[in-house]
């Protein structure tokens, strides 16, 4: 199981195929996504890579966080997240993962924080039908109606769908196809919509419900400090 990457949502556009058909895509940008730490079975009880992306000033950063980046010899990162991997998919600390970590045509799962909508009523939040337009209904056309029973159960159950805060939820969208890659600019174009607003942080990883293409680099495509892009050679029959 390979590592994913941390990207930022740039926005949506469209690309055209050779047949003239257009494909709506979301542009994701890798902002110097580097490995900042390892999690091992012996020390932590599980195997994972800790990745960081973006840049951050150290003025208001806690000393413990500054020390973490100093040990890894990488610049302080705005966003830090962990990705579970197998032991054979570890990438050296300090390596920068590139956009061609994925291949065109493969499917990925993306996770982000949905756009906040504020306080919303039942019709917008839960797609309720509302009340009638006439026949005695006044003012309450968009209300949700009754929320409970009578004497029994004598209360409104927890998790009842009611008006409230909408959005700002952690959303995962499965099986988005990679349409194009721009390694020089660190761009990944995936087909369809990605949850979150422009500039939001997005976790991108190999799709869990689709097979990984054979041409996908293992453990990944990355660039070490002062070196060329590297990827471990995949052994035949491994």
Curated annotation (Swiss-Prot):
SUPFAM superfamilies: Translation proteins. Residues 225-238 have a biased composition (Low complexity). GO terms for molecular function: rRNA binding; structural constituent of ribosome. GO terms for biological process: translation. The modification N5-methylglutamine is found at residue 151. PROSITE patterns: RIBOSOMAL_L3. Keywords: Methylation, Ribonucleoprotein, Ribosomal protein, RNA-binding, rRNA-binding. GO terms for cellular component: cytosolic large ribosomal subunit. InterPro entries: Ribosomal_uL3, Ribosomal_uL3_bac/org-type, Ribosomal_uL3_CS, Transl_B-barrel_sf. Methylated by PrmB. Part of the 50S ribosomal subunit. Forms a cluster with proteins L14 and L19. This is Large ribosomal subunit protein uL3. It comes from Bradyrhizobium diazoefficiens (strain JCM 10833 / BCRC 13528 / IAM 13628 / NBRC 14792 / USDA 110). The gene is rplC.
């Amino acid at each position: 199981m390979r590592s994913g990457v941390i990207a930022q949502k740039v926005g949506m556009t469209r690309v055209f195929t050779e047949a003239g058909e257009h494909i709506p895509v979301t542009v994701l940008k890798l902002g110097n996504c580097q490995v900042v730490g390892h999690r091992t079975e012996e020390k932590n009880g599980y195997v994972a890579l800790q990745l960081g992306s973006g840049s951050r000033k150290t003025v208001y950063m806690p000393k413990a966080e500054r020390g973490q980046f100093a040990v890894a010899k990488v610049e302080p990162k705005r966003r830090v997240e962990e990705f579970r991997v197998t032991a054979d998919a570890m990438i050296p600390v300090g390596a920068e993962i590139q956009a061609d970590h994925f291949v065109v045509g493969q499917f990925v799962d993306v996770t982000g924080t949905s756009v906040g909508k504020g306080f919303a009523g039942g019709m917008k939040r839960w797609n309720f039908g509302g009340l009638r337009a006439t026949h005695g209904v006044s003012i309450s056309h968009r209300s949700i109606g009754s929320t409970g029973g009578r004497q029994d159960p004598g209360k409104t159950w927890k998790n009842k769908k009611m008006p409230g805060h909408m959005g700002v939820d952690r959303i995962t969208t499965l099986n988005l196809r990679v349409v194009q890659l721009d390694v020089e600019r660190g761009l990944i174009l995936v087909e369809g919509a990605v949850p979150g607003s422009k500039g939001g942080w997005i976790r991108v990883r190999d799709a869990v419900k689709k097979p990984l293409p054979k041409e996908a680099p293992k453990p990944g495509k990355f660039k070490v400090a002062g070196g060329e892009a590297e990827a471990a050679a995949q052994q035949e029959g491994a």
